[in-house]
Amino acid sequence: MQQNKLSLSVQYADTRVQDILTRPLLRKWVKAALLAPAQITLRFVDAAEGQILNRNYRGKDYATNVLTFTYNDDDGSDIADDAVTQADIILCTDVLQREAAEQNKTLIFHAAHLVIHGVLHAQGYDHESDEEAEEMEALEIEFLAALGFPNPYIEA
């Protein structure tokens, strides 16, 4: 598989996970899901910041696990296919930890899944329709398997 160039910034607004979800680990996960060169910021936030962002940008007044913000050309159109993917991916540590516990998964496994999920969103993948969801889930399963993780959609 081709290694795509990555410029990665990691921000720990919520520092509780910085010793577990380290920059080298995050870089490995992001690169596993890259289909093109990218400039990506991963930001770990608490529930309060996650809720504010979800409310302000999606109109949903609760913290969610991952939000992906992509950048468009000045005219509002999508970035050209051959351009560098640019995105901010926000991960809410409170939701990550809660979901991992509820799903009997390690924080590492669940975080890897959601980082890959966010990177796929940054590259234009979505799950609004069943067909889109199946395509996105298949890629998530493939990329996670390449990293040594099991299928995240099979209940433990």
UniProtKB/Swiss-Prot annotation:
Example of a GO MF term: metalloendopeptidase activity
Needed cofactors: Zn(2+)
Location within or outside the cell: Cytoplasm
Organism expressing this protein natively: Herminiimonas arsenicoxydans
Alphabetically ordered keywords of this record: Cytoplasm, Endonuclease, Hydrolase, Metal-binding, Nuclease, Ribosome biogenesis, rRNA processing, Zinc
Designated name of the protein: Endoribonuclease YbeY
Any GO BP: rRNA processing
Gene Ontology cellular component annotations, sorted alphabetically: cytoplasm
Record note on cofactor: Binds 1 zinc ion.
